[in-house]
Amino acid sequence: PPELAKRIPFPGPALATRIVGEVTEGRLEIVREATAIVEKELEKSRAFQYMAVLLNDKATGIRENKREFGQIIVVRCINSVDARTATVTKIPWNKLNRISKRITSIKGVNRCLYDLTPKPPATIEYI
């Protein structure tokens, strides 16, 4: 059926593959929330695949007038026919801005990046 054949691919080991570095319950919750945002915002993009990835590094930021060292989420949205090569999906600035605001509202996240790297040299997934 089309709903299965045309669905966005998702890795077998689930959300753990969207976390670079140690996988903990807290980090799983962050990537789970970010994934829900990305999927809702990009479901009509007609992209081959889109995802939120939690990096192993942290970034300095400011929240409520206090300095914080927060998590970094990368949003990746790509177009492909066969998954052997892929190009970056051009997403309107206002949508990227909304995604960034929503993701940085997740507790502990203060940075949201959009990955502009095609395949090759990158792969579709991070891990």
What do these predicted regions represent?
Residues 1-127:
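ATP/NTP-dependent adenylation/nucleotidyl-transfer catalytic domains that generate, transfer
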